[in-house]
Amino acid sequence: MANFTKQAIKASFIKLLNQKPLSKISVRDIVEDCGINRNSFYYHFQDIPSLLGEIVTEQTDELIRQYPTISSMEECFSVAFHTARENRRAVMHIFNSANRDMFLQDTMRLCEYVVDTYLTTVFSDASISGDDRRVVVQFMKCQLFGVWIDWVSSGMKEESLSDLQRMLQLCRGVPELIVAHSNNRQL
């Protein structure tokens, strides 16, 4: 029963977040939407930011579980952009709220996972030093995160995605060059 209530609270919050800004959602709105009392809400969550944090972390973890391997840069970007597009209004409401730091931290964690998984999948047999791998992950993670943030801060426009596809075409082969440069340095 407790897990059902907790899931109902999360579902109501996400529904409301897709309807109005985070700052306009109250505990009262959530409990009225899912038909519980305030005490039930506070039994499960300290406040709305803790509810938001748990939802964002769970959704990030779920995305990570869904992609045990990633075989192209296009797939890297697709993972980062797919869920945001599905929940565009909610993402914009979180991004434009005072609680966006936790959202950005989990987005950065997702970007790091995606890049690390891509490198492991595509370059599993390439010999790249631990230091170089760390630097490459840092570089590519920040690149992915930066493009994602730019897209969200510009309103998540659909037409921006075609520019992103073109950027990926222009950058095709860059990860391979980075690994090749790492191997040349080691010689």
Question: What is each residue range found by the language model?
Answer:
Residues 1-20, 24-27, 33-187:
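Alpha-helical bundle regulatory/interaction domains
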